[in-house]
């Protein structure tokens, strides 16, 4: 879809929680929902508003055609104005010094902690490696659990078979040594 975004890099989308706090996600399965003011708000599949580089929810006027919205690699959401000129709105991409320190709140929703360090807004800091946004893609696991379980069972059985073959070989050599005596 036009609002499916994958992040290539270490960044996270910044979103506003129901409690007013800022949280972070890599889930780029976004959609436009009706905002309180009647505009179209970019939100996660759970309805959390995606934030612009100023920390405000991204809301477009209700007169814009959402299928004409594009995203540049630097994270700018572009929509055509009345004269069909692209109007960019920056999407906040936050990076952390220590991603392992983030506190997981939900399936793909994280909160910064003292261990993760403060979020660094990529748009406002030139000293961080920039992430890029790829439109039309979603980030997903590259591991198929069922396939890997089958592979693990096959490997375990092969190991057992080899172990039994070595045990049988040892027993045969021991019997051969006993026959010499």
Please give the residue ranges for each predicted region.
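Amphipathic alpha-helical polymerization modules
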Residues: 1-181
